[in-house]
Amino acid sequence: MLKFLMVLFSSLMLNACSDHQAERVHFNGTDVSNAEYAKDFDLTDHLGQPRRLADYKGKLVLVFFGYTHCPDVCPTTLTDMTKVMKLLGSQREKVQVVFITLDPERDSRALLAKYVPSFDATFVGLYGTSAQIDKVAKDFKVFHERKNTAGAESYSIDHSAGTYVYDQSGKLRLYFKYGQKPHEIANDLKMLM
C-alpha cells in the first residue's frame, strides 16, 4: 500500500510540474517583467496634452525612443509598428504606440504632430525639455548622444533602439530589440491581451 501511495504521489507531482510548464508563455521579445526601471514618464504629447503612462491604462503600450531627423532606425521602427497594427486587425484598439523624442531641440510639438501620425493616426509623439527627456531616457536605460556633423545645425543622435511593452495595468512586460519582425511582435501582443 505504501508503495502504491508513493507511486501515486510521484505521478501527481510530475503531472503538476508538467502542467506548470505548459502554462509558461514563450515570447519572441525579451521578458522584462521583473525589471525595476522604465516605470513612468511625464511628458507632453503632440497635441499639447500632458501624458503619463497611466493615461493609457487598459491598453498595451509600446514605447520607442527616437527623433524625427533619424535617417534609418526610427522610421523603420515606426513602419514596423504600422505593420504590427495591421496584423492585429480589430485588436489594434487595445494598443497604443508612443514615440518619445530624444531631440527636443528640433522636435517641436508641430513637427511631432506631422511626423508621428504620418505612420499611423493613432500613434502619439511625446516631447519635453532637455532635462525631462534626459531624466526619462535615464530611467528607461536609453543611451543617447548628440554627434555633430557638417554645419552648426546639422547633427545626428546615436541612441539605443528597442521598444518597451507595457500590459493593460501599466506593468513593464517585454522588450523588443531593433529589427524584431512585425509578426513576432503582433503574436506577443496577442498573448498579452
Per-range role (PLM):
Residues 4-12:
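Sec-dependent N-terminal signal peptides
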Residues 15-16:
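C-terminal motif of bacterial Sec signal peptides marking the signal peptidase cleavage site
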Residues 22-54, 79:
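N-terminal "domain-start" segment that seeds a small globular fold
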Residues 54-75:
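Short active-site neighborhood of thiol/selenol oxidoreductases, capturing the structured segment around
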Residues 73-88:
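Typically the conserved alpha-helix immediately C-terminal to a functionally engaged Cys/Sec
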Residues 95-106, 123-131:
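Thiol-based oxidoreductase modules, predominantly thioredoxin-like and allied folds used
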Residues 113-160:
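Short, internal strand/loop/helix patches
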